[in-house]
Amino acid sequence: MAHPKRKISKTRRDKRRTHYKAVASQFVECSNCSAPVLLHIVCPECGHYRGKLAIEKALAV
């Protein structure tokens, strides 16, 4: 197996890892039903996307 030739300092290691970070999901409000929805995703509550009906939702009886 490969072995490092030199010790990598904590600073150098951490500088390499600066791009690995957690990013929070962006939520927006649905323009039709005001439910929180992920960006660029059809609303799971009403089926609308950008003001148009994208998915026919079955009515709950």
Swiss-Prot record:
The keyword Amino-acid biosynthesis does not apply. One of its GO terms (molecular function) is structural constituent of ribosome. GO terms for cellular component: large ribosomal subunit. Transmembrane segments: none annotated. Keywords: Ribonucleoprotein, Ribosomal protein. GO terms for biological process: translation. InterPro entries: Ribosomal_bL32, Ribosomal_bL32_bact, Ribosomal_zn-bd. The keyword Ribosomal protein applies. NCBIfam families: rpmF_bact (TIGR01031). This is Large ribosomal subunit protein bL32. The lineage of its organism: Bacteria, Pseudomonadati, Bacteroidota, Cytophagia, Cytophagales. The gene is rpmF.
